[in-house]
């Protein structure tokens, strides 16, 4: 699939929108992602596989949202959030395709658990492990981006106008 065209379609339909203040919400979204992941782990350990499945997906959702916010966009569709991850991060070699595939699988398992009462220990485990990988990578990417931005803002740190001096 051509993710650039699909990204443009999401923008045209207003399922993705630019939002200048989004960059100020990155930390908040990442905190929500971490909280959801902790809840998913606790639920799994208690045998609450339905809630673990759901919380694991939402951990990934909020992690992806933090990444999207870091680029100045806001999603209005779970599907377009996935499209944005593929276009803005996978297409540039920052995220592996499998991480977004896992997020899409997690969304399907979340929908089954939430709307059809169809869930299992195996599905909960899959979502939980996928969420751990996704959140770890999101944190890495956001930490690197924050450090680069911080260095550009403070030239004495060894960066000037985006280049090492």
Predicted feature residues:
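Terminal alpha-helical segments
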Residues: 1-165
